[in-house]
Amino acid sequence: MAFQKDAKSSAYSSRFQTPFRRRREGKTDYYQRKRLVTQHKAKYNTPKYRLVVRFTNKDIICQIISSTITGDVVLAAAYSHELPRYGITHGLTNWAAAYATGLLIARRTLQKLGLDETYKGVEEVEGEYELTEAVEDGPRPFKVFLDIGLQRTTTGARVFGALKGASDGGLYVPHSENRFPGWDFETEEIDPELLRSYIFGGHVSQYMEELADDDEERFSELFKGYLADDIDADSLEDIYTSAHEAIRADPAFKPTEKKFTKEQYAAESKKYRQTKLSKEERAARVAAKIAALAGQQ
């Protein structure tokens, strides 16, 4: 039987519904977004906030976002590239960095709303499962819902590190403990010690020790930055502990200091930009080339 191409009829074309642009590009799960954005009709103009967590190759992005008819509005944002200010200079995309970034966005948001003294979260981290509860005779905790986008909800994934950091920071994020590292599917219980070790970079310390014993060349290659700053496996927990304290002490955003002003950057870029010649300059350039060729003959 000869191959026959499946032709699209006029009925197919006339009834075809074009998907949303971000669905066509594979960027947005609208089934998920609809449920994260839709607010209860009896709450009228009350925004519904979500904790948006995204990962790049070199950064972790945490944002508190609400949705409006005209577009999404960002209430607060925190990035893992801000962590060097608090003492975390390496491993800015690992699980412990995700926790620290989540803690930073929580404290920054509550400070902006004036709730940082009312809801301090979990100051002594033991790896236990805790939800932020409302205080008596006070405002309710700030409620957000985790938005993971297109990421897979694998048990122990870094996105849940940011969730844990935000929850321990004082935000009310509805969740259960069955996606954190240390969850046992058979006993349906969590191992607090293992979860705590992830929060303070214990998994990195363990890998550093194992790699140093097994393959010293690979160890010196992977942890070159750590070795240059005299950071060993035993000092990681102290670094993260002091960073958490520093984040709680001053979570406010501070813009990075630029090396040059905008005018200096513009002047520098003009050095390498080819300027457009006028008609007279082009004619003079052609005449000079003709004269040079005539001189060679």
UniProtKB/Swiss-Prot annotation:
Chief localization: cytoplasm
Keyword vocabulary terms for this entry: Cytoplasm, Isopeptide bond, Nucleus, Phosphoprotein, Ribonucleoprotein, Ribosomal protein, RNA-binding, rRNA-binding, Ubl conjugation
Sites bearing Phosphoserine, chain numbering: S167, S176, S235
GO MF entries: 5S rRNA binding; structural constituent of ribosome
UniProt-listed InterPro entries: Rbsml_uL18_euk, Ribosomal_uL18_C_euk
GO CC annotations, alphabetized: cytoplasm; cytosol; cytosolic large ribosomal subunit; nucleus
One Pfam match: Ribosomal_L5e
Record has ATP-binding as a keyword: no
CDD domains: Ribosomal_L18_L5e (cd00432)
Protein's cellular compartments: Cytoplasm; Nucleus
GO biological process, one term: cytoplasmic translation
Covalent cross-link Glycyl lysine isopeptide (Lys-Gly) (interchain with G-Cter in ubiquitin) as placed by the record, residue numbers: K164
Biological role: Component of the ribosome, a large ribonucleoprotein complex responsible for the synthesis of proteins in the cell. The small ribosomal subunit (SSU) binds messenger RNAs (mRNAs) and translates the encoded message by selecting cognate aminoacyl-transfer RNA (tRNA) molecules. The large subunit (LSU) contains the ribosomal catalytic site termed the peptidyl transferase center (PTC), which catalyzes the formation of peptide bonds, thereby polymerizing the amino acids delivered by tRNAs into a polypeptide chain.
Similarity field: Belongs to the universal ribosomal protein uL18 family.
Subunit (UniProt): Component of the large ribosomal subunit (LSU). Mature yeast ribosomes consist of a small (40S) and a large (60S) subunit. The 40S small subunit contains 1 molecule of ribosomal RNA (18S rRNA) and 33 different proteins (encoded by 57 genes). The large 60S subunit contains 3 rRNA molecules (25S, 5.8S and 5S rRNA) and 46 different proteins (encoded by 81 genes). Component of a hexameric 5S RNP precursor complex, composed of 5S RNA, RRS1, RPF2, RPL5, RPL11A/RPL11B and SYO1; this complex acts as a precursor for ribosome assembly.
Protein's recorded name: Large ribosomal subunit protein uL18
Chain's gene name: RPL5
